[in-house]
Amino acid sequence: MKNRFYLITAVILLLPCTLRAQWSVGLLGGAGYNVHSQDLHYLTDHRLQGAAGLNFGLTGQYDVTDWFGLRMDATFTQKNYRQYRTDLKEMDYHYRNDYLLVPVLASFRFGGARLKGFANAGVYGGWWLSCSQQGSELNSFSGKTYEFSRKVDFNADKDNRLDLGLAGGLGMEYGISRHWAVQLEARGYYSLASQVKQYMRVQDYRYDTTVVLQAACLYRF
């Protein structure tokens, strides 16, 4: 008898949350800025500079209540950067790194019926899809500078293609109608996985911090 009472009580308590639960799916797109960090050791005239990149993909969210939901995205995100030398200005490298990122986030919403603010926080996993390089180099034999654009092949012993880290963002949402809504969000990705495996005696850790500004169009079921 007590078990039935507990079961009925649990159903009654969870019923309002179930009735309010709502699925939404959509498309998102925007642009980002990536900052690459690494220990340059004795390379005293080498410099690193952040660079802009694209960000677009799919999003899905399950709203448990009117103020809390679970969100997961799948995005194509670029983590680009520039490396150059101050003593040899001919040596200038621009790296384009394409990633597939899958953030899983807790989403907290607040505000009115149509215009709401939200905060997302969670973790992400990703995969380094491709890398390319363009810029200029100095030929030490001829003394001439030449420009190049080339694809960089991955080295299984050196490159760590698995990306893991923290993700979070702040944004606004406007409900156009019962089923449609648009969002604008500023989100940050902080990588906890080095791009380089520590296969040498000298440690070489390389990390990315990426901030994106993205807009999304959502359909609510």
What kind of region is each of these model predictions?
Residues 136-154, 198-205:
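Solvent-exposed, glycine/polar-rich loop segments of beta-barrel outer-membrane systems
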Residues 158, 163, 168, 174-221:
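Predominantly the C-terminal beta-signal and adjacent terminal strand-loop region
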